[in-house]
Amino acid sequence: MSHAVLKSALAVFAIDPAAIGGLWLRARASPQRQAFLDCLAACSPPLPITRLAPNISDDALFGGLDAAATLSIERPVFRSGLLDRDAILVLPMAERCDPGLAARLAQILDNKRHSIIALDEAAEEGEGVPPALIDRLGLFVNLDGLRFKSILEPIEINAIVAARALLPKVRVPHMLVTEVVRA
């Protein structure tokens, strides 16, 4: 993957991560992957970045009844979940994501309020991010084989801010959308 393609992927994601759905990042834990993620964070995405545990519970995601607090004060107490606020969700070890969690995360992406960075550390060809998530992630970046010196510098933040401001004015002809989808 070339430097220009990496920079373009970062820019597209940083401009409107919720609209793009997310980013499938194939790379083992490495200085290259961390440099890419640091560069993404430096682009000041419009949503906060939250790291998920690979085995996160539904209560932690969606919130729910806090049993201990409810028993303590003898009336229902609800606690919020991570999904109560819009965010970019970083999913480590996405290749090991449980199908049920993948389905719930896919459903979340359909609301266009969240985005996911799926960190795919798959070592073998048969492993990978669950298809339910892949279908909703608009970008794929493969850092395998890149040397550390080829990782890019942060994108000019003023360009990202300007692109965000122009985004509502962009109109794409239906025929162009059809052609891109067919390609």
Question: What residue ranges belong to the model's regions?
Answer:
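Conserved ASCE/P-loop NTPase catalytic core
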Residues: M1-L137, V141-D144
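Basic, amphipathic alpha-helical bundle interface domains used for macromolecular binding and assembly
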Residues: A102, R147-A183
